[in-house]
Regions:
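Outer-membrane beta-barrel translocator/channel fold
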Residues: 36-48, 83-87, 107-142, 293-316, ...
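Outer membrane beta-barrel
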Residues: 68-176, 210, 370
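Residues that define the transmembrane beta-barrel architecture of outer-membrane proteins
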Residues: 49-57, 88-93, 141-145, 152, ...
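Repeated loop/turn-to-beta-strand initiation elements of outer-membrane beta-barrel proteins
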Residues: 29, 67-72, 103-106, 155-158, ...
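Surface-exposed beta-loop-beta
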Residues: 177-273
Length: 378
């Protein structure tokens, strides 16, 4: 089975700064709108279209109290998709109040938190749910209701989270692409009797030791990665409870950047996951302003072919080009190869640049190749 996606888009952004009548408040309004098109090289196995166009709107409202430390950010999101009703959806990416005093920071509302250092996968990144209809690589996330306290001390930084509500993963509908047959049901199952109202907790400690940045994290609550159960002729996502311990390490040694993410997760199954590797940067290629990063990573999951994610015994190799021009042109390309099955691999290309101060273009291309029926990508 082979699938290829090419996705191109334009981004229009504008910013307006407004000062309220009261001198102690400042308001900033900005936002973006983008036109996106996905093109597949072949029709879907269930007859889905080869093309898929959509519009995205993402305004941003920022408020800051100039005579105090309070600030509030509100970022709503909406996508209209011409083909897939399930991909047409809205979300509150952020509605977060921040205040700080001394060594302490308090955030409350809806927010996004990213943990991770590696390129090919982010094992330790467990706070936010994946907005799976948005991107193939799982980088897009839904906003997460939270209370987040940060304590910054000389001995390190600690982050404490209370997560009072769970967000279900989004999935493509019947007319959408990159889905199983039948489509995944919107009727989710939960291990906890509290379902989406289960209160989750998370903690992270981080500190710089010279050129090495080390983080240790713990999460207890509803697993963001669903299992799948066949019920009544439907594939239903099943959200189990889990505990996870994670560690992420990133260190700079000359032009080398070494990375590690390692987790142990206790959920419906118990497993260990590892992503580790390096990125070497060739600065000023042939006396030019262009920098090239050479990336290599190894991915391991102790569940083998029973893993719910890609990368149980795989290697990733890639190149990152930074052209260092005034348009901020960047290109990333890479390939992940399954070491157990030579016919299982996927490749990606990401490229972006500014047209002017208001317009930006971006292209994402993905190739999936698989002839092994028991592999997740099949």
């Amino acid at each position: 089975m082979k699938k290829t996606i090419v996705k191109g888009g334009q981004l229009l952004a504008s910013t307006l700064l407004v000062t309220a009548a009261l001198p102690c408040f400042g308001i900033e309004l900005s936002g973006s709108a983008s036109l996106e098109h996905r093109q597949f090289f072949s029709s879907g196995l269930q007859g889905q279209d080869r093309g898929q166009s959509s519009l995205v709107f993402e305004p941003e409202f920022y408020w800051q109290q100039s005579e105090g430390n309070g600030r509030f950010t509100f970022i709503p999101f909406y996508r209209w998709d011409a083909v897939d009703e399930e991909r047409s959806h809205g979300d509150i990416r952020e509605a977060l109040y921040l205040n700080y005093w001394g060594d302490y920071e308090l955030r409350a509302g809806v927010g996004k938190v990213f943990w991770g250092v590696t390129e090919s996968a982010h094992l330790v990144d467990v706070i936010n749910q994946t907005d799976a209809v948005e991107s193939v690589d799982g980088e897009a996330k839904l906003g997460q209701p939270m209370v987040h306290v940060t304590v910054v001390k000389e001995w390190g930084t600690t982050d404490w989270f209370v997560l009072p509500y769970f967000r279900e993963r989004t999935f493509s509908g019947e007319e959408g692409r990159l889905r199983p047959n039948p489509p995944i049901s919107q009727d989710a199952l939960y291990q906890s009797s509290q379902a989406e109202k289960h209160i989750d907790f998370a903690f992270r400690y981080s500190k710089m030791f010279g050129d090495w940045d080390i983080g240790v994290s713990y999460f207890k609550g509803t697993n963001r990665d669903p299992y799948y159960r066949l019920s009544g002729g439907e594939i239903k996502p099943y959200y189990a409870q889990m505990s996870q311990v994670g560690i992420d390490i990133q260190g700079i040694v000359g032009d080398w950047l070494w990375k590690l993410e390692n987790i142990y997760r206790d959920s419906d199954d118990h497993h260990t996951g590892v992503v580790t590797g390096f990125e070497y940067t060739w600065v000023g290629v042939l006396d030019s302003v262009v920098d090239i990063g050479f990336i290599a990573e190894y991915l391991y999951d102790s569940r083998g072919n029973n893993a719910q994610t890609i990368g149980q015994n795989d290697v990733f190799a890639g190149l990152r080009f930074a052209f260092n021009d005034e348009d901020g042109t960047e290109v990333l390309m890479g390939m992940t190869q399954d070491l157990d099955n030579i016919d299982v691999y996927n490749a990606k290309l990401e490229a972006s640049s500014r047209i002017n101060n208001q317009l930006k273009w971006r292209i994402d291309a993905w190739l999936f190749e698989n002839e092994t029926a028991n592999d997740l990508l099949y």
